UniProtKB/Swiss-Prot annotation:
Keyword terms of this UniProt record: Developmental protein, DNA-binding, Nucleus, Transcription, Transcription regulation
UniProt entry tagged with the keyword Transcription: yes
Lineage: Eukaryota, Viridiplantae, Streptophyta, Embryophyta, Tracheophyta
Biological function: Transcription regulator involved in the dorsovental asymmetry of flowers. Promotes dorsal identity.
Protein's UniProt name: Transcription factor DICHOTOMA
Native source organism of the sequence: Antirrhinum majus (Garden snapdragon)
Length: 314
């Protein structure tokens, strides 16, 4: 009645759709192909008029389901890549001025052994508790560290103010040796801000005083030279007066004013006896006048030399 060949004819599936094939599509979705085979066979048995399915149509339908509407294998790769979500970092980071810091810390072998020994002695179950205990015990050391940092920052800021005040000072008075030493001290780090400023002011005041003394000495020497070169110094009376005044300057402040007055009176009397008129002196006494002038010039030169020595000593 029934033809055995009709029931024993199974649809032949091409080797490309075999679940053991080497193609990428079949190897990824082998279970779907087996179910598809089961549907095809069951439909063949149940249908009164079974349809002969061609392998090309079966493969195209499967490829359309897997690859999308376009049948592009790149779409399959994109869909698989979208499904793999990247792993998120479960450990939150701590934002610090130098950048974000990870809460996880990697310890060296020696420190890790010491740390876990301490944790076992304390009986804590978490490392964070051990670190909290260590931080609480070292509060005083942390305070000292903060104070030392603040003091160092204040000291580093103070020399800049001192340097500005030193640079704003009068530069012409820094030429002396003591002025250079004072500036050298002020250029270093100021341990006490106000003390360094006071020292700089004192050094500048001393330099000004020394400069004033030098100018006074130079003016005195200049005046003496001008008086020596004047034409009226040929007068004998002026010569004797200048001689007595220079003897007073050379002898110093220890000479007595009364003795000098007596000498000047005696000189005037001699001049009246020997020279009755101011300009009517006789040619016989001309040699004496030249002697007086030579003595005056020699004494003035001695005075200049003494003043120069006094200047270099100071």
């Amino acid at each position: 009645m029934f033809n055995k060949k009709r029931y024993l004819q199974y649809p032949q599936v091409p080797p490309s759709l075999n679940p053991r094939a080497s193609t990428s599509v079949v190897s990824l979705n082998g279970n779907e192909i087996l179910l598809h085979h089961h549907d095809v066979i069951s439909g063949y048995y149940l249908a009164s008029n079974p349809q002969n399915l061609e392998p090309d149509a079966l493969f195209n339908g499967f490829h359309h389901d897997v690859g999308g509407t376009n049948g592009d294998p790149l779409v399959l790769a994109n869909t698989l890549a979208k499904k793999h979500t990247p792993k998120k970092d479960r450990h939150s980071k701590i934002n610090r001025p130098q950048g974000p810091r990870d809460r996880r810390v990697r310890l060296s072998i020696g420190i890790a052994r010491k740390f876990f020994d301490l944790q076992e002695m304390l009986g804590f179950d978490k490392p964070s508790k051990t670190l909290d205990w260590l931080l609480t015990k070292s509060k005083e050391a942390i305070k000292e560290l903060v104070q030392s940092k603040s003091s160092k920052s204040n000291i580093s800021n103070s020399p800049s103010e001192c340097d500005q005040e030193v640079l704003s000072a009068d530069l012409p008075y820094i030429g002396s040796s003591k002025g250079k030493a004072a500036v050298g001290l002020n250029s270093n780090k100021c341990k006490g801000g106000r003390d360094a400023v006071d020292l700089a002011k004192e050094s500048r005041a001393k330099a000004r005083a020394r400069a004033r003394e030098r100018t006074k000495e130079k003016m005195c020497i200049k005046q003496l030279n001008q008086e020596r070169n004047k034409s009226y110094e040929w007068n004998p009376s002026v010569l004797f007066q200048s001689k007595s005044s220079q003897q007073f300057e050379v002898s110093g402040p220890s000479t007595n004013y009364e003795e000098l007055n007596q000498e000047s009176i005696m000189i005037k009397r001699k001049l009246k006896q020997n020279h009755p008129s101011m300009f009517g002196f006789q040619p016989e006494n001309a040699t004496e006048n030249w002697d007086y002038y030579s003595n005056f010039t020699s004494q003035s030169n001695q005075l200049c030399a003494i003043l120069d020595q006094h200047k270099f000593i100071n």
